[in-house]
């Protein structure tokens, strides 16, 4: 039998005792991350019926489930992740590494000539536990997501992204502020206290 490390055992204990994990199982959501988006939605009313949305870092599908329900049958949702994701009705899923150009091109092809109202990203790299390694990797994903958003958003569109405080954050924040009318930070209660993650919200893309 493989012995679990102490940190692994602690994570499992925290995971299964987590009230948001239990609530997700009860509500039929695929991950506790659904509640982060739901809390932001309750405050900011980002997602509305009929919208076109891109969901980056979508697997296992918690944010896509929430978004699909809120945009309804007249909306359009394109989701992407490096990992597999079980299908969700009316969601176009593109599997692949977002850092590769061919995956970006597939997303752009799915968007087509019509632009989107909202880009959301819960992407994070595989964490090593070493901030000097993890933060630059995370910021690289954030930069790629912002680049995509500037290509596909309609003027007035919105952008929501997971971001980690650390090197490169201030420069990135300045860049987002130059492209959106209003920029705010969100830390949902369902985000674990010890996590460095926050969510950056850009409203009103300047186009």
Curated annotation (Swiss-Prot):
Record-annotated active site: 162
Which keywords describe this protein according to UniProt?
Cytoplasm, Methyltransferase, rRNA processing, S-adenosyl-L-methionine, Transferase
- Give the EC class as a word: transferase
Xref: InterPro entries: RNA_methyltr_RlmE, RNA_MeTrfase_FtsJ_dom, rRNA-MeTfrase_E, SAM-dependent_MTases_sf
Annotated coiled-coil positions are none
Whether Transport counts among this entry's keywords is no
Residues the entry annotates as binding S-adenosyl-L-methionine:
61, 63, 81, 97, 122
Primary location recorded for the protein, binned into one broad class: cytoplasm
For whether the record's keyword set contains Membrane, the answer is no
This protein's GO CC annotations: cytoplasm
Write down the chemical reaction(s) this protein catalyses: uridine(2552) in 23S rRNA + S-adenosyl-L-methionine = 2'-O-methyluridine(2552) in 23S rRNA + S-adenosyl-L-homocysteine + H(+)
Known EC number(s)? 2.1.1.166
What Gene3D superfamilies does its record include? Vaccinia Virus protein VP39
**Record's subcellular location:** Cytoplasm
Question: One GO molecular function term?
Answer: rRNA (uridine-2'-O-)-methyltransferase activity
Cited function: Specifically methylates the uridine in position 2552 of 23S rRNA at the 2'-O position of the ribose in the fully assembled 50S ribosomal subunit.
* NCBIfam families registered for this protein in UniProt: PRK11188.1
Family membership noted in the UniProt record: Belongs to the class I-like SAM-binding methyltransferase superfamily. RNA methyltransferase RlmE family.
Q: Which protein is depicted?
A: Ribosomal RNA large subunit methyltransferase E
Gene symbol? Answer: rlmE
């Amino acid at each position: 039998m493989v012995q679990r490390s102490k940190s692994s055992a602690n994570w499992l204990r925290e995971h299964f005792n987590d009230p948001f994990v239990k609530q997700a199982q009860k509500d039929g959501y695929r991950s506790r991350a659904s509640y982060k988006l739901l809390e932001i939605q309750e405050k900011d009313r980002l997602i509305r019926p009929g919208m076109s949305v891109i969901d980056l870092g979508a697997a296992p599908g918690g944010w896509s489930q929430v978004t699909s329900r809120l945009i309804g049958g007249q909306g359009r949702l394109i989701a992407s992740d490096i990992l597999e994701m079980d299908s969700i009705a009316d969601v176009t899923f593109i599997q692949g590494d977002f850092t590769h150009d061919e995956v970006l091109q597939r997303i752009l092809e799915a968007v087509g000539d019509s632009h989107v109202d909202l880009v959301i990203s819960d992407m994070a790299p595989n964490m090593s536990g070493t901030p000097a390694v993890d933060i630059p990797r995370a910021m690289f994903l954030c930069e790629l997501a912002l680049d995509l958003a500037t290509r596909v958003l309609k003027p007035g569109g919105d952008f929501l992204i997971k971001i980690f405080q650390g090197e490169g954050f201030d420069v990135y924040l300045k860049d987002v502020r130059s492209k959106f009318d209003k920029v705010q930070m969100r830390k949902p209660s369902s985000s674990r206290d010890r996590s460095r993650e926050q969510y950056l919200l850009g409203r009103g893309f300047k186009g």
